[in-house]
């Protein structure tokens, strides 16, 4: 991501500048705006830091507690939120600071086979520690989230129809409804899994490779209390588009093998979560229209083939 450089003398909000200087209690050398409410702050002496705006004090405090406990229990592949600096409030955000890791020139990519395996191994290591952490976190409800997402997509039907044929839209909806019906009938199987603190947002940009080559997990904004399979499901959905035959190759990933006969997991894989999510976002901003259209139309046949294969596996398991 291109960083937009600013100094402490930049023509920004004077109230923000004043609060930042008071928070730091020293003058920064530079303040680089990375994105939205995230800044990189450097000093003449000492380590740089990241300044991030959280939606509430509770969210800052929850992540402060999580990262602290992770470090205490030996999980070091994430950042540490600075506890000696209490966050300051500005325009509805609570700004707190955390470690900055210089990134590697070689970015983490789901298209890379080794990266895919390393990423889910990191998730597993995180879960192995987080299952021993007692922390107040939201309880994740996959079915509720997906029903809301499908409902919103249906409301956006007339908007999507401007770009995609009704036949294709209806097919996406049909798979969404079929998936949810099967998922609801079988998700009780997941209650057998131990609850952990899940990451909740397994997008590629939340796996940061540091300059020393270490892969780290960042951004716990969507952390929740849930079975680890929720993170694995997200991960499987993210990497499936990079596999030639996802319905088969997903089960070659060690952490996913146990779910190849799990009906809830299989039904969930046939839910077009990315299609619904991206079109629902697009209705607010059309900047990514072309890429979402390609995913929905040009990627349609390949996705249908994957879903049909998964449906056959489900049918076979239901007969047993």
Please identify what each model-predicted range represents.
Residues 1-26, 289-320:
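Regulatory N- and C-terminal appendages and interdomain linkers associated
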Residues 153-199, 309-320:
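An alpha-helical support segment within catalytic cores of ATP-dependent transferases
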Residues 95-109, 132, 151-159, 276-287:
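A glycine-centered beta->alpha junction motif in the catalytic cores
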Residues 230-287, 298-306:
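Active-site activation/catalytic loop segments of kinase-like enzymes and analogous catalytic loops
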